[in-house]
């Protein structure tokens, strides 16, 4: 009976972590594809030049893939050392997430202010030779979200000149339209648009976050239960 429960728990955890590992592989693949296909598609922030969408997805994918592999191997080998390592890794990730969320809400006003300032400083690099990625990023977000600048369209004036904005700020985009002072522009800043997007999708984002939290807690519960079960039955596959 005990052995049957152990087998059931072992393969349940293996399948759970196999899905986890496959998700990590998928994220890693998407990150590599973004890095290769988008070239210098970079971050908006000059303070964190390596924090691009591609690098972020690659980092998350790698962490998920390694964690999933650790859980798969620990479960199928019934290795207490690997199971305990898997539990500790998930616990560290969970605590880091909670700390970041708490800090974000405690210092929300300061985060918003610093983010706006950093993004405005990034605008100064818009037309520089080595920052094609930043230029592409701004062009895409302004076209997709129908916004202009960080707080509003006037953020571009110190960068491109008085009454001059990127062409993607125009409601009807055409070559050179940003230099025409009579052209209708998107007047809302992109920072506000992004905040509105998060607010409109907060229920979906909350659901996704809750699913991730449940998966982490289940992973920790499975690993510790299997660890205790192996310990009680005297199964020894320790490295």
Swiss-Prot record:
Glycans are attached at residue 180. Strongly expressed in megakaryocytes, platelets and lung. Weakly expressed in bone marrow, brain and kidney (at protein level). PROSITE patterns: TM4_1 (PS00421). GO terms for biological process: collagen-activated tyrosine kinase receptor signaling pathway; mitocytosis; neutrophil homeostasis; platelet aggregation; receptor diffusion trapping; regulation of mitochondrial membrane potential. Gene3D superfamilies: Tetraspanin. GO terms for cellular component: membrane; migrasome; tetraspanin-enriched microdomain. Keywords: Glycoprotein, Membrane, Transmembrane, Transmembrane helix. The keyword Transmembrane helix applies. Residues 1-13, 77-85, 225-239 are cytoplasmic. CDD domains: NET-5_like_LEL. GO terms for molecular function: signaling receptor binding. It holds the Pfam family Tetraspanin. Its main location: membrane. Glycosylated. It is a multi-pass membrane protein. Belongs to the tetraspanin (TM4SF) family. Found in a complex with GP6. PANTHER family: TETRASPANIN (PTHR19282), TETRASPANIN-9 (PTHR19282:SF41). This is Tetraspanin-9.
